[in-house]
Amino acid sequence: MSEEQKTISISELESMNIKQLYEIAKSLGIPRYTSMRKRDLIFAILKAQTESTGYFFGEGVLEIHPEGFGFLRRIEDNLLPSNDDIYISPSQIRKFNLNTGDIISGVIRKPKEGEKYFAMIKIEAINYRPVEAVNDRVNFDNLTPDYPRERFILETDPKIYSTRLIDLFAPIGKGQRGMIVAPPKAGKTTILKEIANGIAENHPDTIRIILLIDERPEEVTDIRESTNAIVIAAPFDMPPDKQVKVAELTLEMAKRLVEFNYDVVILLDSLTRLARVYNIVVPPSGKLLTGGVDPAALYKPKRFFGAARNTREGGSLTIIATALVETGSKMDEVIFEEFKGTGNMELVLSRQLANKRIFPAINLLLSGTRREELLLDEETLKKVWLLRRMLSAMTEEEGLTLILNKLSETSSNEEFLKLIDKEKARY
């Protein structure tokens, strides 16, 4: 490789077209470069360039310590401290105005004698952008929140009915704060996976994060293997203080990405368990709600859920979180009541439908999105309202079965809505 190629910066790579990037990738011997998206290809080139000079290329999520230095935590290690962490010096943090949660990529060196960690010697990119972009960022708390105005299209395979139903009855916009109200065994995890894959297929530039709190380890493996998303997990066998750390660093990472104008989606399973974990970790305030919930423990989960917003200045943070109901636990009931009404979209799952093995077990009448008129065009909106009026005259089971039968006869929601025109006269 020529000396000139060794010094290509991320800014220069971003300004190149895909054909030029392919030529560089070919000369560097990068495998399967034609199947990569542009951003992934740029980072593969940076990595290959760095390694050809005898150094390493490293990346991680920055956690700054009170003493002023920081470490890059690996997503593969669920953002927890490990021996593979990369040291960032206080001077680098000050020079580039870095914050906890920034994703840092750059040239790293091996630990010297007496050192324990790899160290960053040159920062190449901050949040997948050239380092100069840090000067244009607006702090997350100073961004103006707005209603979601641009819809995520989730519909993919005609046979995946859950995403088709969500698109019609509870559309998700960029910046939505959504809650999936789920009794046990109603299929919430399957719906989360289908939402993640729907966004991945139709909106590939969106950064998708699935955050699993207090879940079973085998479920974590299943979600990792079946979704196209970043999966960060704090399973039930992890100490509560570490689970809290994972959740907080994940939120900081998402906020930093929004500051850089990315559309970020966090799928949280589950908000109830996150609140339970905080209830263990937070120092007692001396007051107790029914079920043993400390009111002080609910502040941080509310802060997490409340971070979801569309912003007028650019990026958006969408959070779709599951809330557990009908578990037999008074604590879960209190947590759900505290969060009820804080979201602007609700998807309600039904235990009765799930018991009869009618999936997706969605209660269509109780599910919906606030200000859906900002997300759906007028024609679609009228037809969805007509469907709701039809469903109100039927039982929960009859309504869902009718809609699922009609969806199975059509290959897309567009075709399904045209079918309504033909049958309108009958109702």
Curated annotation (Swiss-Prot):
Name all Rho RNA-BD domain ranges: 55-130
Which InterPro entries did the record assign?
A: AAA+_ATPase (IPR003593), ATPase_F1/V1/A1_a/bsu_nucl-bd (IPR000194), CSD (IPR011129), NA-bd_OB-fold (IPR012340), P-loop_NTPase (IPR027417), Rho-like_N (IPR011112), Rho_factor_ATP-bd (IPR041703), Rho_N_sf (IPR036269)
Q: Which SMART domains match?
A: AAA (SM00382), CSP (SM00357), Rho_N (SM00959)
What are the alphabetically sorted keywords of the record? ATP-binding, Helicase, Hydrolase, Nucleotide-binding, RNA-binding, Transcription, Transcription regulation, Transcription termination
UniProt entry tagged with the keyword Transcription: yes
- Disulphide bond pairs: none
Which GO BP terms sit in this record? DNA-templated transcription termination
Chain positions recorded as ATP binding sites = 173-178, 185-190, 216
- Xref: CDD domains: Rho_CSD (cd04459), rho_factor_C (cd01128)
GO molecular function term, any single one: ATP binding
Keyword rRNA-binding (UniProt): no
EC numbers for this chain:
3.6.4.-
HAMAP family attached here? Answer: Rho (MF_01884)
Q: Give the multimer and partner information.
A: Homohexamer. The homohexamer assembles into an open ring structure.
Role played: Facilitates transcription termination by a mechanism that involves Rho binding to the nascent RNA, activation of Rho's RNA-dependent ATPase activity, and release of the mRNA from the DNA template.
Q: Which family does it belong to?
A: Belongs to the Rho family.
Q: What is this protein called?
A: Transcription termination factor Rho
